[in-house]
UniProtKB/Swiss-Prot annotation:
Cross-referenced Pfam families: PrmA (PF06325)
GO BP annotation list: methylation
Assigned EC number: 2.1.1.-
Protein name stated in the entry: Ribosomal protein L11 methyltransferase
């Protein structure tokens, strides 16, 4: 079978929001292999001899099967993209073979050093760890969270900064499980996560096991936080949309142990003050703010 590679380059005043909206079109129309491409520096030397140049513009790409209905589906993509207010989207297509598609998406993923010692390694990239490196083995999949997005990268760095040996850890919106993997390798004790997507729960579990984390040492449930058992945790992490974070702050508050902290990411800068106000209204004290690109991550503790 042949596939149609669809690429959407976009420009907007709020690039973070534009990225979300354009990507949502691709997901809604069930494109395969969706990748968000953002301008980044060239990979560091030693991050894989096969590494290619990083993209120089913001774009979203995905794949459609080359069928009789493909023209109609592409027209639907264009219609939805043209309807986005304040976002200039340029679409392009090319035909690729099955084998080309199976390998081409790998071009966009590299070994990524998140901090001085925290590293994410895709299976097809060569990498020699330095002494003291904590390496997360993770291949991009269906679930959100590969470490390449600013929100995940900030979360990982903050987990490394905030985790203490033996700490109890809860990941709200587990996605790929990358934050749970990091917490486990950084010394967390109790390790739990939840996601409302059953596919993500299954993927996360496999990713943890791939990183040699025993299934007996973690638990991931397909549920929402309001339905999750009322346990107490030393560190609760939520890398999700800002409006969702605001809505679940009372639940996060009730899940924190005395002295516990929450790491909140997935917050577009335009929502920063609203989230901070909601934290104060829900009995939190802001401990730290960090920014990367158009995104903000916060650390808060109980008053």
């Amino acid at each position: 079978m042949k596939w149609i590679h669809v690429n959407a380059r976009f420009e907007a005043d709020d690039m973070a929001l534009a990225e979300e909206l354009v990507a949502q079109i691709f997901f809604d129309l069930d494109l395969k292999g969706v990748v968000c491409e953002v301008p980044l520096p060239e990979p560091d030397e030693g991050f894989g001899s096969n590494a290619l140049a990083q993209p120089d513009t913001h774009s979203i790409s995905g794949y459609l099967p080359d069928l009789s209905t493909s023209d109609l589906l592409f027209a639907d993509i264009k219609k939805k993209a043209d309807a986005l207010k304040g976002i200039n989207v340029t679409l392009s297509t090319r035909i690729v073979d099955d084998q080309d598609w199976a390998e081409s998406w790998k071009d966009f993923f590299f070994v990524t050093r998140i901090t001085d010692t925290l590293v994410i390694r895709p299976s097809w990239r060569e990498f020699e760890p330095k002494p003291g490196d904590v390496v997360i083995d993770l291949d991009p999949g269906m679930a959100f969270g590969t470490g390449t997005h600013e929100t995940t990268a900030m979360c990982l760095a903050l987990v490394q900064e905030q985790i203490t040996p033996g700490a109890s850890f809860l990941d709200v919106g587990t996605g790929s499980g990358i934050l749970m993997i990091a917490a486990a390798k950084l010394g967390a004790g109790t390790l739990k996560g939840l996601d409302n997507d059953e596919a993500a729960v299954q993927i996360a579990g496999k990713n943890l096991e791939h990183n040699r984390i025993s299934p007996q040492s973690f638990e991931i449930r397909c549920t929402t936080l309001d339905r999750y058992p009322h346990e107490k945790f030393d560190l609760v992490v939520a890398n999700i949309l800002a409006e969702v974070i605001i809505s679940i702050l009372p639940e996060i508050h009730s899940r924190l142990a005395p002295g516990g902290r929450a790491i909140l990411s997935g917050i577009i800068i335009a929502w920063e003050e609203r989230v901070k106000t909601a934290l104060e209204d829900n009995g939190f004290t802001l401990v730290k703010t960090t920014t990367q690109g158009e995104w903000v991550a916060l650390v808060a503790e109980l008053v």
